[in-house]
């Protein structure tokens, strides 16, 4: 029974992570709160029309 619960919990957590991650791309592009640079990067590289600096990395939002 414990194994079944563990499998279900793992599936639930993975699904939650996937849903949260969908719609934004966390890149390894370094940035210093310069959102303009991130927007340019997101448009050029990922064809996504907006991006912002979070935790010194660019995050692209469609």
From Swiss-Prot:
Cysteine-cysteine disulfides: 31-53, 38-58, 42-60
Entry superkingdom: Eukaryota
GO MF annotation: an example: toxin activity
Keywords on record: Disulfide bond, Ion channel impairing toxin, Neurotoxin, Potassium channel impairing toxin, Secreted, Signal, Toxin
Signal peptide (residue range): 1-23
Tissue: Expressed by the venom gland.
Cellular localization per UniProt: Secreted
InterPro entries (alphabetical): Scorpion_toxin-like_sf (IPR036574), Scorpion_toxinS_K_inh (IPR001947)
Predominant location: secreted
Record GO cellular component, one term: extracellular region
Pfam families, alphabetized: Toxin_2
Domain comment quoted from the record: Has the structural arrangement of an alpha-helix connected to a beta-sheet by disulfide bonds (CSalpha/beta).
Family, per entry: Belongs to the short scorpion toxin superfamily. Potassium channel inhibitor family. Alpha-KTx 15 subfamily.
Functional summary from the UniProt entry: Blocker of A-type voltage-gated potassium channels of cerebellar granular cells. May also inhibit Kv4/KCND when coexpressed with DPP6 or DPP10. The occlusion of the outer entry of the K(+) conducting pore is partially reversible and affects both open and closed channels. It shares the same target in rat brain than BmTX3 (AC Q8I0L5) and AmmTX3 (AC P60208). Recombinant toxin inhibits mKv1.3/KCNA3 channel (IC(50)=0.49 nM).
Additional notes on this entry: Negative results: shows weak blockage on mKv1.1/KCNA1, hKv1.2/KCNA2, hERG/Kv11.1/KCNH2, and hKCa2.3/KCNN3.
Protein's recorded name: Potassium channel toxin alpha-KTx Ctri9577
Annotated organism of origin: Chaerilus tricostatus (Scorpion)
Lineage of the organism: Eukaryota, Metazoa, Ecdysozoa, Arthropoda, Chelicerata
């Amino acid at each position: 029974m414990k194994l079944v619960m563990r499998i279900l919990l793992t599936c639930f957590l993975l699904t939650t992570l996937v849903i949260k991650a969908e719609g934004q791309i966390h890149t390894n592009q370094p940035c210093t709160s310069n959102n303009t640079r991130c927007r340019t990067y997101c448009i050029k590289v990922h064809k996504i029309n907006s991006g912002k600096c979070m935790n010194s990395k660019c995050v692209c939002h469609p």
